[in-house]
């Protein structure tokens, strides 16, 4: 949706017309993905959180963009639809002063279609988690919190991720919680190796909390000592293989 706002053409007298036509065009592409077998689609930046903080959540422009977004994803009820929201990431820089979801939480939870809402949280010190308290027992969407930052190059530890998850569980039930990064690592600055360590920490951190909740853990190859290639001299790899988690 953010890209649609930047379209400039003399073919349309009203920016809303081009946005709506682009939403319909995108809908055809998304339905084609669905028909090809795709069962999980993420939509990047509907911009509701930016616009709600600028104009107010009930502004006519915001209402129109919600309608356009819902038109874009129409007919995808059999696909898990992710709605990605962060606060910008040019060269891994913070660019927004007001990064509160307070004006947009109702939009994302109640007014727009989708199954999973992703939020930038780690880099904002989990600000706004308390906003989910009134919805805790009736969340219609899964909530994907960022548990590692896409702007910090220091690799996170599994214990760090587990700590972020515990904070989120105070306001979001485990069956509705998804753990992710704040945003993608594919922009400028973060190399593949650091991104790998951060992603691995997410998986291992989830397992720490799963054990605490009595839930089944998942196998994480990155934590399997048997697969380790940079073995420290004198370390007994076989004795540590059991910690693969």
What are the language-model segments listed below?
Residues 1-245:
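Domain-level signal for soluble alpha/beta catalytic cores
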